[in-house]
């Protein structure tokens, strides 16, 4: 620690008490990185841990935990029940020493402490230790433990498990390990290295492990939608508009990252053709030290003709050594058709564990019925990868300096004919009245930089590329010739707007300021956080010409009342979770219902089409306009929603429609019908029963230009 080094290096004797205080303060403080949505700048928040004797701690900041999956996980009753049963089956010795790694709210630790007490462990030397490195969650766990009278029965460590030491922290090696460091892919949260380190440093010989084993499965599928999510080259060839993001022999210069992509595949059930039966990929035995790397060669017999566009995968947990307690993330069709008990397990919709999709490259791999295909599966410490028919695309997936990897939805958008046409026509109209323009691409849009450069050979294009930076510049150099422009036309600044000066623009006025808007790394954020474009436009105000063309020229905040029972249940407030009171976490985790007053949970980003059962209960309403011809300013809007369908209204979906050209009525919508965009979802404090002609809802919203946040309020009335 630098502060300690300064004290020790001054040559003065350092009082041991002063050093202890300093070390304690540093150990009880954490820094949380937060992205400012309007600037793209990273900001640090300081999270303090209260002293042990403080029995009325301040709750951890709500915004840090409300956007996590903890609440959804705690509402997963099948998961909670399976862990409780497995822990009770494992804790049979009253002298058991239990270690919970990645303890979260402490639920598994409390289950272990209760099971230990049931076998007399409190008087026989049994113990439970909980390791949670994320300080905001650790603070919340202490509140949960106090609420359940468990603060003296579970020892909490705010450390990573590889920082724990036997004798310094743990009295002796643990003989039972419980953990849930699992993601949708299974390995992505560091399960293997965590278990390896625990076996090496923290566990006794032959420990009991919960969960005991995991098995991953896969299935070959054909799906036009999944094909569009990864094959930009062939989809833009179908668009035939002359703009080539992936020209000629460079079809992989823009691609989806070669990894498993989490997705709610049940929502695609009606548009997927299954080309094989489910097949087993890897079995991970957690009851012994796991290997870092393995490879499996699998023969798969196809069940029909088609093109393999993707492999959909999932996993099944066996939580106990007896093989009687299971949890599965299998898609609905696999659970319904499987003859295996673990796969048949039926559970509620949840969002914290999804299925995963691995994309084939290009148009897919052709297959005929009853053909045997060879699949090579590999795993390292954090991921699983696939190679179908060996010698296929896997060897070419290394990322070169000019290659760009994007999220699947962005790939699909760039290949969408209607989206491309809207931008092309708008830019073409703008260039007819602008000769030799100076154009600033205010975001990370490769498409707009290529489009303007190829359409206007005399233009000067300045690409800000705050996220792409040097990789964006290398990419443009590679595709310039194929798009018939000189790379000398384009200058990549690689800066945020706050750092740009007139010198960067060669003291020329900007005639065109354009964006999609798209900021690399912000794709999963709330829709209005792309109003960063408005903030950029404001910072560049003095550099714009009087008649500058701005695209988009306006944003319109839209909303639609929705029935979202599955999402509501996963975000609903907690009371009893397997016998433990969790009501103290509701406000911090952003739960719905049973909060003080009419307090609502936060508005969160979701692909609404993936949110289980959904139903629109009203038409689409406009709530607020953002006029980009003006500098950024506060905005307020309100509307009255009249319902067109009866049902239970759980909240509303909200998004921004981008007006590219107001005169030509060219608008790009990002609403729920467009599956390439996330919407904001504001759930109500309580669901409302609505009827057409009888129910009315008033919604108000305000935009704060200093934070980029939009706050909502709503009230409903029923006419007799």
Curated annotation (Swiss-Prot):
InterPro entries, per the entry: Arg_MeTrfase, MeTrfase_PRMT7, PRMT_dom, SAM-dependent_MTases_sf
GO biological process, one term: regulation of DNA-templated transcription
SAM-dependent MTase PRMT-type domain sequence ranges: 54-385, 387-720
Top EC category: transferase
Its EC number(s): 2.1.1.-
Domain of life per record: Eukaryota
Statement: the UniProt record of this protein carries the keyword S-adenosyl-L-methionine: yes
Summary of the function given for this chain in its UniProt record: Arginine methyltransferase that can both catalyze the formation of omega-N monomethylarginine (MMA) and symmetrical dimethylarginine (sDMA).
Name of the molecule in the record: Protein arginine N-methyltransferase 7
Organism: Oryza sativa subsp. japonica (Rice)
């Amino acid at each position: 620690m630098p502060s300690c080094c300064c004290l020790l290096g001054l040559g003065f004797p350092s009082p041991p008490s002063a050093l202890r205080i300093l070390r304690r303060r540093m150990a009880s403080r954490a820094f949380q990185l937060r992205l400012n949505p309007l600037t793209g700048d990273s900001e640090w928040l300081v999270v303090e841990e209260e002293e042990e004797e403080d029995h009325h701690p301040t709750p951890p900041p709500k915004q840090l935990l409300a956007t996590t999956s903890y609440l959804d996980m705690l509402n997963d009753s099948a998961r909670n029940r399976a862990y409780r049963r497995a822990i009770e089956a494992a804790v049979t010795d009253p002298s058991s020493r239990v270690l919970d790694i990645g303890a979260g709210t402490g639920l598994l630790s409390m289950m272990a402490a209760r099971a230990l007490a049931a076998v007399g462990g409190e008087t026989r030397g049994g113990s439970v230790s909980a390791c949670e490195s994320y300080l905001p969650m650790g603070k919340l766990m202490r509140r949960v433990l106090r609420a359940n009278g468990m603060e003296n029965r579970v020892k909490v460590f705010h450390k990573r498990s590889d920082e724990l030491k036997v004798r310094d922290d743990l009295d002796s090696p643990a003989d039972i390990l419980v953990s849930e460091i699992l993601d949708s892919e299974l390995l992505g949260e560091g399960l293997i290295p965590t278990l390896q380190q625990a076996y090496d440093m923290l566990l006794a010989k032959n420990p009991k492990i919960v969960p005991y084993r995991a098995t991953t499965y896969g299935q070959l599928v054909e799906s036009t939608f999944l094909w569009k999510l990864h094959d930009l080259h062939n989809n833009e060839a179908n668009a035939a508009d002359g703009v080539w993001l992936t020209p000629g022999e460079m079809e992989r210069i823009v691609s989806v990252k070669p990894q498993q992509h989490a997705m709610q595949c049940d929502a695609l059930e009606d548009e997927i053709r299954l080309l094989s039966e489910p097949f087993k990929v890897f079995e991970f035995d957690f009851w012994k030290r796991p290997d870092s790397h393995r490879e499996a060669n699998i023969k798969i017999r196809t069940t029909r003709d088609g093109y393999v566009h993707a492999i959909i995968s999932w996993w099944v947990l066996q939580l106990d050594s007896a093989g009687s307690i299971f949890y599965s993330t299998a898609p609905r069709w696999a659970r319904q058709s499987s003859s295996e008990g673990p796969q048949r397990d039926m559970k509620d919709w949840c969002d914290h564990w999804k299925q995963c999709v691995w994309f084939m490259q290009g148009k897919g791999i052709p297959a005929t019925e009853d053909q045997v295909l060879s699949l090579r599966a590999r795993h390292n410490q954090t991921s699983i990868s696939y190679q179908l028919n060996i010698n296929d695309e896997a060897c070419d997936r290394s990322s070169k300096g000019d290659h760009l990897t994007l999220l699947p939805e962005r790939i699909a958008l760039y290949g969408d004919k209607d989206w491309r046409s809207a931008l092309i026509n708008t830019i073409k109209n703008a260039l007819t009245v602008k000769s030799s323009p100076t154009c600033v691409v205010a975001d990370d849009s490769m498409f707009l930089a290529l489009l303007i450069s190829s359409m206007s050979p005399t233009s000067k294009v300045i690409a800000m590329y705050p996220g792409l930076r040097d990789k964006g510049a290398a990419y443009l150099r590679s595709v310039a010739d194929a798009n018939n422009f000189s790379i000398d036309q384009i200058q990549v600044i690689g800066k945020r707007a706050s750092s740009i000066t007139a010198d960067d623009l060669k003291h020329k006025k900007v005639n065109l300021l354009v964006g999609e808007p798209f900021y690399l790394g912000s794709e999963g954020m709330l829709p209005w956080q792309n109003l960063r474009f408005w903030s950029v436009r404001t910072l560049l105000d003095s550099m714009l010409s009087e008649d500058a063309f701005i695209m988009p020229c306006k944003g319109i905040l839209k909303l639609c009342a929705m029935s979202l029972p599955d999402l509501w249940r996963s975000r609903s407030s907690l009371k009893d979770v397997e016998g433990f009171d969790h009501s103290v976490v509701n406000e911090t985790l952003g739960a719905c219902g049973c909060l003080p007053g009419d307090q609502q949970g936060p508005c969160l980003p979701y692909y609404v089409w993936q949110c289980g059962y959904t139903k629109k209960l009203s038409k689409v309403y406009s709530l607020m306009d953002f006029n980009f011809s003006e500098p950024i300013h506060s905005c307020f809007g309100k509307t009255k929603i009249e319902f067109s369908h009866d049902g239970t209204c759980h909240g509303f979906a909200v998004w921004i429609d981008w007006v590219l050209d107001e005169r030509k009525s060219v608008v790009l919508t990002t609403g729920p019908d467009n599956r390439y965009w996330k919407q904001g979802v504001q759930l109500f404090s309580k669901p409302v029963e609505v009827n057409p002609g009888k129910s009315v809802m008033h919604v108000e919203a305000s935009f704060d230009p200093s934070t980029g946040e939009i706050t909502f309020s709503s009230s409903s009335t029923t006419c007799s």
